[in-house]
Amino acid sequence: MIRVTAVQPESIAEELGLAEGTELLAVNGRELEDFLDWEFLTAEEEFLLHVRQPDGEEIEYEIERPLGEPLGVSLEPARIRRCANRCDFCFVDGLPDGLRDVLYIRDDDYRLSFRYGNFATLTNLKPKDIERIIEFRLSPLYVSVHATDPTVRRYLLRNPTAPEILPQLRHFADHGIEFHTQVVMSPGVNDGGVLEQTLRELYEFGSAILGCSVVPVGLTEFSKHHLVREPTAEECQAAIRLVEARAAVARRERGIYWAFGADELYVRAGVELPPAEIYDGFDQVENGVGSVRWLQRQIETGADELQGWAGRRIGVVTGTAMGQLMPMVLDPLARATGATFELIPVVNTLFGASVTTAGLLPGIALQQALTGRRDLDLALLPGEAINDDGLFMDSMSLDLLSAGVPMELRLSKDFIDALHVPAAA
């Protein structure tokens, strides 16, 4: 059963008399569990819809509509599938007290993997879940492998009953499911020979595995586990050599690069980022893989379209990890627009200075960095630092942040989109 939370005016749902609180029970006699059932089972032009109205009356409708026309209902969020693992590097364990309750939820949900590209370990799948993934062809999935060696993987996940990952992936691959994979590299555990084995076995698995990224483990000052540490520059350099060696094999044999190091891996190693063409279409850019080169490409292809910025001063707020890399993005943007760009790296006051990614910056740190900056016409904030409800990690809203600074603010994941409209005079 799925509950309706809103009905769009002048929609099919409104014509049927559906309302907030209506319970969607079944489609063509099949009970509805969540948004996946709803989307896939109502994809046809004609179907039977069984509902229970707020007054308790149950009605079955025969739906006929043009293919692709939405019914016009908003659904209550699905209950998030909780994680069965206890990884030493779990982000939730590194959160300070006092944040929003939702931030402490350990999610490991294949549905979110398919819909949003969230990485999942697949350790909590039930037989019914496996059947749904295959039936609905939920592909590609984003899978946290970490290690193909079962003993090492179970140690990393702190889950002695975790199923072996390669047979799991094989079963899905035999039914047409593809995967993007990642390894969160924990030094002394799944680097070195273990990482080489993982990359080799995932590559030799076949074309169903579209690629594998290697991301260095990140810890906050609140992390509760002491068996894991962040990698040194030398350890990151060694990992890069393994990644690039596997990428060279893939390039030679398949015409793709397949193996990628996250931008942060290169930053920690003190090694120059590889060129844009090695990222195979930037499929894992949301995972911090190729982010800088992706921004460069957006600027190369779209900066000439930007008008009305000559002489304006723009602050670009980011985490400290990107501070040394952003000039290669901003310098060509400044030349194309005539604007002056100032990079404003911000130390994370919520999680500690060791957390350097822009997406985890709290609103208060952003506000403090911009307070009194009347010399700026505009400040670009990292769009990934705010959620769909308009809140930063510390629950500060964008409106509250804006009220405390003297310049216009814009959220930015793509500089071209953010600067498409000139700043107010």
Each PLM stretch: what is its role?
Residues 30-38, 57-60:
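Short, Lys/Arg- and Gly-enriched loop/turn segments at beta-strand edges
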Residues 140-142, 178-180, 211-213, 258-260, ...:
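Structural preference for beta-strand elements that scaffold enzyme active sites
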Residues 3, 269-425:
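Radical SAM enzyme core and accessory elements
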Residues 15-33:
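Conserved PDZ fold ligand-binding element
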Residues 189, 209-235, 254-277, 348-353, ...:
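Flexible glycine/acidic-rich beta-alpha junction loops that bind and position SAM and/or redox cofactors
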Residues 1-8:
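PDZ/PDZ-like groove recognition
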